[in-house]
């Protein structure tokens, strides 16, 4: 008799995706981040649901309701800090997942890659709106500054901003709609993640050497489920260390002050995971130019597959491209650092150089490196 997991309509889908899935035998720990992102999403939805039970999306009570969660709700502090630091873990896993895709040439699965970019935008939107909800100083001013950027769009900009605000400034209407969107978006992210997996399973996984692995595959379970379990364990170790020992390390002290429209904080900055994009935005003196650069800093990932001109898929045997890749990583770390610094000399010029370098590496230096390596292969 055939096993029920192979015949039952629902279990068959689970079986083909998570149990009998043919997986390349040589994939490394870098292939763990997809499942870690799934776990992050589950943690965020679960903790977020319990937070939503006690949170009130009203400007007069939002800040107090978050304080009430931390002080009066059973393990409320734990749920709140798991949610806040869970977002940081989410972005760490996201950046490593995208970095892996760039290094090993996974972007040649164009549909999977493009849905991944959509997922990145959706998660960034969710995180931004979530940061507004505690209604602290940085929540309010972050929302004001970032939504105000849309006013740079010619002709419809101002109308668009007021439409998003639901008035003439960030106020009660804005907070209420941001809460509604913040609640619904993770479910849209979950649906997109299913589509992401669907397209991935059409082609099968890439592997470190970037060659066809049809001749050498293993079932996902038990060979990779055990590696996934170890990944979960390590992620929980880092997350719980953050939550239990230094829960506010990645946050901003200004957000412990209630939102005050009459008092601007000395340095308005977003959460650490947006700092690289914020640095690119600030490095351009023109408002519209800054907004375009901000969007392009992420959207540039969509043209990476078309810039790939190497005879090899992965970077594992391409030392010049590897140098360019690690230069890009160093540049992103520099941008992240600059995004958290005040707008003054020498940070302005460092940010501008790092921003130019970011686009130059991706658009010019990486394709040139590939061409050079192709030439070397012929010699």
Swiss-Prot record:
GO BP terms in the entry: mitochondrial electron transport, ubiquinol to cytochrome c
Residues engaged in binding a ubiquinone: 201
Keyword Zinc: no
GO molecular function: metal ion binding; ubiquinol-cytochrome-c reductase activity
Transcription regulation is among the record's keywords: no
Pfam family of the protein (one): Cytochrom_B_C
Binding site for heme b b562: 83, 182
CDD domains in UniProt: cytochrome_b_C, Cytochrome_b_N
Membrane protein topology class: Multi-pass membrane protein
Matches recorded under SUPFAM superfamilies: a domain/subunit of cytochrome bc1 complex (Ubiquinol-cytochrome c reductase), Transmembrane di-heme cytochromes
Annotated localization: Mitochondrion inner membrane
UniProt-listed InterPro entries: Cyt_b/b6_C (IPR005798), Cyt_b/b6_C_sf (IPR036150), Cyt_b/b6_N (IPR005797), Cytb/b6-like_sf (IPR027387), Cytochrome_b (IPR030689), Cytochrome_b_C_euk/bac (IPR048260), Cytochrome_b_N_euk/bac (IPR048259), Di-haem_cyt_TM (IPR016174)
Gene Ontology CC: mitochondrial inner membrane; respiratory chain complex III
Binding site for heme b b566: 97, 196
Co-factor note (free text): Binds 2 heme b groups non-covalently.
Region forming the signal peptide: none
Family: Belongs to the cytochrome b family.
PANTHER family associated with the record: CYTOCHROME B
Additional information: Heme 1 (or BL or b562) is low-potential and absorbs at about 562 nm, and heme 2 (or BH or b566) is high-potential and absorbs at about 566 nm.
Name this polypeptide is given: Cytochrome b
Organism of provenance: Jaculus jaculus
Biological classification of the source: Eukaryota, Metazoa, Chordata, Craniata, Vertebrata
